[in-house]
Regions:
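Small, basic N-terminal interaction modules of short regulatory proteins
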Residues: 1-55, 81, 85-94
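Short, glycine/alanine-rich amphipathic alpha-helical segment
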Residues: 57-72
Length: 94
């Protein structure tokens, strides 16, 4: 069976199938990044904003683990926001 035959049997257009696939991928990514953010919040028992303030206030005392975690957490937070935007755009897309 070819891909074209499978698409035909679904009764959906190629665009609809692609949109659904993209949405499922985006939801999966969002879930992953939400879980990673939750791990950092649990580990440090504070929000990202509060953790940023704490790490930035400790300029004389370097804690490489916390600084690395801050960079990771900032990346994860940015990725979470980006995927959320993609989900919103996919919901609005034709």
């Amino acid at each position: 069976m070819t891909v074209s035959e499978i698409i035909e049997r679904t009764g959906q257009s190629e665009v609809a199938i692609l949109r659904e696939h993209l949405l499922l991928t985006a939801l999966s990514k969002r879930s992953r990044y939400e879980a990673e953010c939750a791990l950092f919040e649990k580990k440090y028992e504070q929000t990202l904003d509060d953790f940023q303030k704490r790490v930035n206030a400790q300029r004389r005392e370097e804690d490489f683990t916390q600084e690395d975690d801050l960079l990771d957490w900032e990346f994860v937070d940015a990725a979470l926001k980006w995927w959320q935007t993609q989900i919103e755009e996919l919901h609005c897309a034709d």
